[in-house]
Amino acid sequence: MHNLHLPYNDYGSTMRRRLGGRVQKLAIDAHLGCPHRNAESNKGGCTFCLGEAFTPSYCNTQHSITEQINSAIEFHTSRNRSADKYLAYFQAGTNTFADTDTLNRLYSEALAHPEIDGIIIGTRPDCISSEILDLLEDFSHNYYVAVEYGIESTSDVILRHVNRGHDYATAVQAVTATKARNIDVGAHFILGLPYETREEILAQTATINALNLDFVKFH
């Protein structure tokens, strides 16, 4: 079923059909950091990274996952954004950058909240493992689960310029492995990165389509 008013399937309408009501993502900061930015790695991080720019005011790493969810629901409700379904969106940082016991505890706390119907895990394609996918697959039997990979570009040259720390082949492997578990997979791409031409931006279209993603974000 396609949205009759848009030349593409928009995220909101698609999720409404799938989950049976208006869906609101609630950003969560699990304070897991990033393997590409921490002091031990000495890699410096991506040149474009500024986590504070997209972290909502209600995300407070001093608060528990449950407290952040409560604050997020209050935040959206006060702005007339109440929803029928809520998804805990582990957005800030790399949300698979921990041992599986820690991840299980964090994800389980979110899913134990009575208002939460599923989780979306934002992470890097070079920070996923079969053990983590096992965990997410187990959750997916009872809840909506999606993984959102920061791919940013299909060009290895551009990825090196922005010090991304992985190549495009790594992203393809991560997406393929995740989809094999019947878990929804999304990806972020940044258009207009340094040294990227308009022709290169447009040429990515077929490559991105070949990933068969369930959803995609362009920045």
Regions found by a protein language model. Give the residues of each.
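Acidic (Asp/Glu)-rich catalytic clusters
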Residues: 77-81, 106-114, 134-144, 176-180
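Active-site mouth loops of central-metabolism enzymes
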Residues: 37, 92-100, 192-199
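Conserved C-terminal portion of the radical SAM core fold
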Residues: 169-219
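Core AdoMet radical
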Residues: 52-72, 76-100, 115-128, 144-170, ...
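N-terminal [4Fe-4S]-dependent radical SAM core
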Residues: 1-87
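Distinct, well-ordered alpha-helical segments
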Residues: 100-108, 129-138, 199-201
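Short, surface-exposed connector motifs at secondary-structure boundaries
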Residues: 113-119, 184-187
